Amino acid sequence: MALKDRFDKIISYFDTDDVSENEVHEVQERTSVQRDSRAATAQEASQRSHMTNSAEEEMIGSRPRTSTYDPNRQERQRVQRDNAYQQATPRVQNKDSVRQQREQVTIALKYPRKYEDAQEIVDLLIVNECVLIDFQYMLDAQARRCLDYIDGASRVLYGSLQKVGSSMFLLTPANVMVDIEEMNIPKTGQETSFDFDMKRR
């Protein structure tokens, strides 16, 4: 009897809720929209770099070509390249002005409803976004699997996964430091809590 219970527990770990075809199509549509937006972003970046390169070529190409030797020609070309480079790249100022121009950090709030949503959360970590994950809409077994997947991905990507609530976790990339003092997490109606070790209770 104990052996049968153990097999049932192992099998239930890999079971997921039945996914309807509508949900499958919905997931496929979301992934195609995400791919399109990523492709558009990459295309914009390549256009910007192409515009910068073409501006430099126009500066160089607009000068008349002379066949006479000019000893200062190479020096002038170097100065022009340096000036073009300095105009294209932002200047680094002292620490006070850098603090004022601090880069904004966004935190995405996700409520995964099925295991497949874990990939979307990991994709956000890949692009260095912080994610606050609340597993309140998932079953216990699915939430454990999802958390296991996210924890593994965060370790591969050198991110950090920290528990901040009874069913909430904060996923941060490597360049974000989170200072959480010990918190006493109140149990607000939810009796189960998820833990990193994924042990069955």
UniProtKB/Swiss-Prot annotation:
Transmembrane segments: none annotated. Its main location: cytoplasm. Residues 27-99 are annotated as: Disordered. Residues 27-38, 72-81 have a biased composition (Basic and acidic residues). InterPro entries: Cell_div_SepF, Cell_div_SepF/SepF-rel, SepF-like_sf. The keyword Iron does not apply. Keywords: Cell cycle, Cell division, Cytoplasm, Septation. It is found in: Cytoplasm. One of its GO terms (cellular component) is cytoplasm. Residues 43-54, 83-92 have a biased composition (Polar residues). GO terms for biological process: division septum assembly; FtsZ-dependent cytokinesis. It comes from the Bacteria. The keyword Transferase does not apply. Cell division protein that is part of the divisome complex and is recruited early to the Z-ring. Probably stimulates Z-ring formation, perhaps through the cross-linking of FtsZ protofilaments. Its function overlaps with FtsA. Belongs to the SepF family. Homodimer. Interacts with FtsZ. This is Cell division protein SepF. It comes from Streptococcus agalactiae serotype Ia (strain ATCC 27591 / A909 / CDC SS700).
